[in-house]
Amino acid sequence: HLEFADNWRYLKAHPLEVTGDILLLAGDIGYLGDDNYSKHPFWDWASENYKEVHCCMGNHEFYKYYDVATLPDGYLLEVRPNVFSHYNGIARIGDTDIILSTLWSRIPLEDAYFTEQVISDFRRILYKGELMTHAQFNAEHERCLTFIKDAVAYSQAAHKIVVTHHVPSFRMLHPKFQGSKANVAFTVELEDYITDSGIDYWIYGHSHTNIDARIGNTQCLSNQLGYVFSNEHQDFSHGKYLTI
């Protein structure tokens, strides 16, 4: 969330610990089409300190009225020569496929009116020139999920990592959100798929809470800074890493 000055001030004062060659970011870095995104000094720092940086796009990437319908599968934005933001993309590094997707979630019809009223996505994101609706939100989820499943199924890599913005199981729902009708805009239940997927790691964001869980043989991980001005950064790890 580099669109907020408090977050950048915090990261400048407490930079990431470089504990690996590749930096993976699960979305909500800033607004696409905004100079503050493309010219942000964080990208220069990340480019200099990591061999490669790969991000999936979060919902906030589209908050300057970006038209999601214009994004094809495999869309790749080169932020710096070794820094990339993906919409339904695959990065092959050595014997590992990194599959990156926003994912979105699935909003049941009975929750659609409430969700459209309380979630900013439906006031800030376009789809085919109009404000996105819950039906289009759900359609993007189906597109993303199909992409992920196909990418995993056809992968010949020894290891597979999935990076999504939205949360892939209610196993990672923080107790403070239990019972909220808005949960359907943040999380989708994919436990049955994940259990037998053969995915090594699934990295997620969006929830501003960090809960790791093992589903089958897949380790689900998160390390979100959240909003510093809301004091959501207390359990953020500056050097969290995984080894393949």
Q: Where do the protein language model's features map onto the residues?
A:
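Short amphipathic alpha-helices and their capping/turn segments at secondary-structure boundaries
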Residues: 11-15, 43-47, 82-95, 99, ...
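Active-site-proximal loop/helix segment associated with metal-binding centers of metalloenzymes
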Residues: 99-161, 166-177
